[in-house]
């Protein structure tokens, strides 16, 4: 829902598709209007959470969506992210980093980091199985980031917030991505070569 600065309703923005199955298509062809009225309504999945980046672009996450669980909406509400991005069906929240990277967390505590176009960079976190351990969760329910690149992940079941700081490797990846997005291709190239020589995939 879009509201102006005075709280007046402007309209709706963004949406989830509601794909029709082959069976539903046959129902549309063969059933009468009265028969269709007796069926469950075809309501698309609702957005579970949203975030807005520094440029005012809206991001949404949809739980139980069949693909495109994360959306980056343009001014018309269309999704700007790659349609083939790797995602999960139990995402519960999304947040945007200072360089446009997208973070999403599942209910089981698995955290995904994507670049600004939706390409997967890192996965980390996970579910705590009968242990008290930092960085894993009983039930993750929210995620946020700050200007230093730290992540704050709420474990709703335990009632605590985990604070995660990026490793030197993750910082190097973010710097290389930032230089590339600014058009500093030669600098980015050298940074990526250094990253490849370091290896590793640890976030925190």
Residue ranges with predicted function:
Residues 1-199:
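Eukaryotic scaffold repeat domains enriched in small/polar residues
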